[in-house]
């Protein structure tokens, strides 16, 4: 159960980061202020919810185990940037993602 909460906290944190990125995207038409407020508002909601879930995680897991699990954020952000904004991801970056996933699996088996 706490693993699910940890993944949700990670996804919400990443959602907040992605909303911040979207807030910086140029618009082809007017409404810049509305666009900015919408995405930054969503970012605050996501990050606030992530913080609440993170506090639940910290009540259960030692911080030395829980915190490295947030490395999942790097994986989610890489995948989202690649899919949503078609950002180029170099092979060495994918290797880094694979190493992060390996580390999470190793740490997760110790929890």
Swiss-Prot record:
Where, by residue number, does the polypeptide cross the bilayer? 38-58, 61-81, 89-109
How does it sit in the bilayer? Multi-pass membrane protein
UniProt domain EamA: residue ranges: 40-109
Which locations, inside or outside the cell, does it occupy?
Cell inner membrane
Q: What is its main location?
A: membrane
* One GO-annotated biological process of the protein: lipopolysaccharide biosynthetic process
| Family matches, as SUPFAM superfamilies | Multidrug resistance efflux transporter EmrE (SSF103481)
Q: Name one GO molecular function term.
A: carbohydrate derivative transmembrane transporter activity
Can you name a GO cellular component term? plasma membrane
Pathway the protein acts in: Bacterial outer membrane biogenesis; lipopolysaccharide biosynthesis
Give the keywords, sorted. Answer: Cell inner membrane, Cell membrane, Lipid A biosynthesis, Lipid biosynthesis, Lipid metabolism, Lipopolysaccharide biosynthesis, Membrane, Transmembrane, Transmembrane helix, Transport
Q: Which InterPro entries match?
A: EamA_dom, Flippase_ArnE, Small_drug/metabolite_transptr
* Role played: Translocates 4-amino-4-deoxy-L-arabinose-phosphoundecaprenol (alpha-L-Ara4N-phosphoundecaprenol) from the cytoplasmic to the periplasmic side of the inner membrane.
Subunit relationships: Heterodimer of ArnE and ArnF.
Q: Which family does it belong to?
A: Belongs to the ArnE family.
Q: What is this protein called?
A: Probable 4-amino-4-deoxy-L-arabinose-phosphoundecaprenol flippase subunit ArnE
The organism's lineage is: Bacteria, Pseudomonadati, Pseudomonadota, Gammaproteobacteria, Enterobacterales
């Amino acid at each position: 159960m706490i693993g699910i909460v940890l993944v949700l906290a990670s996804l919400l944190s990443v959602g907040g980061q992605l909303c911040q990125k979207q807030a910086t995207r140029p618009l082809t038409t007017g409404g810049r202020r509305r666009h900015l407020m919408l995405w930054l508002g969503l970012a605050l909601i996501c990050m606030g919810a992530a913080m609440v879930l993170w506090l639940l995680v910290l009540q259960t897991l030692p911080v030395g185990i829980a915190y490295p699990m947030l490395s999942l954020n790097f994986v989610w952000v890489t995948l989202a940037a690649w899919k949503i904004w078609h950002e180029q991801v170099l092979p060495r970056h994918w290797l880094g993602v694979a190493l992060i996933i390996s580390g999470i699996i190793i740490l997760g088996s110790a929890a």
